[in-house]
């Protein structure tokens, strides 16, 4: 099971970085070879600081969703989870990150689905100590360095 270590962020600091207006995945345009805007992670990634936490991902059960070991998840506890969301769940004493599948709710259970075909869904019913701890709003990935 992919685990997540939860961390509280310091959202009072301001880090304004230059940002390009768009980054095209096709052919580059020489007319856009300049930066003219800025990005403040606390403003742009954090909608509700009091309800936002970071989590360091440990494991590979979400790799097909692009969430890998060592990535940082930005978790917003103020968001209402909906079917298909990537969530952080507390289940039987552990935190995990998975897709939320509510399609079996009328049958008395829900599933937490991995994004890795080597893992099976986790079936959750009333006998489990379970709660949705928060919704993953963003992920931060380290590619190099």
Q: For each predicted feature, which ranges?
A:
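Short, positionally conserved secondary-structure boundary motifs
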Residues: 1-63, 94-95, 109, 118, ...
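Charged, well-structured alpha/beta interaction segments
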Residues: 64, 73-74
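Structural motif
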Residues: 70-71, 85
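Hydrophobic beta-strand signal
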Residues: 74-75, 88
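Short, compositionally biased
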Residues: 83-108
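Flexible, small-/acidic-enriched active-site or ligand-binding loops
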Residues: 117-123
């Amino acid at each position: 099971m992919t685990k997540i270590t939860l961390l509280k962020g310091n959202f009072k600091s301001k880090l304004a970085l230059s940002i390009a207006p768009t980054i095209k995945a096709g052919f580059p345009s020489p007319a856009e070879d300049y930066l003219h805007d800025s990005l403040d992670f606390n403003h742009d990634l954090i909608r509700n600081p009091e309800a936002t936490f970071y989590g360091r991902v440990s494991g590979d059960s979400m790799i097909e969703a692009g969430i890998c070991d060592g990535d940082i998840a930005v978790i917003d506890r103020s968001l209402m989870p909906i079917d298909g969301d990537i969530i952080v769940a507390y289940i039987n004493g552990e935190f995990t990150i998975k897709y939320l599948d509510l399609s079996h709710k009328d049958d008395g259970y829900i599933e937490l689905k991995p994004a890795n075909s080597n893992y099976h869904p986790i079936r959750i019913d009333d006998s489990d100590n379970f709660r949705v701890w928060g919704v993953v709003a963003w992920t931060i990935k380290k590619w190099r360095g």
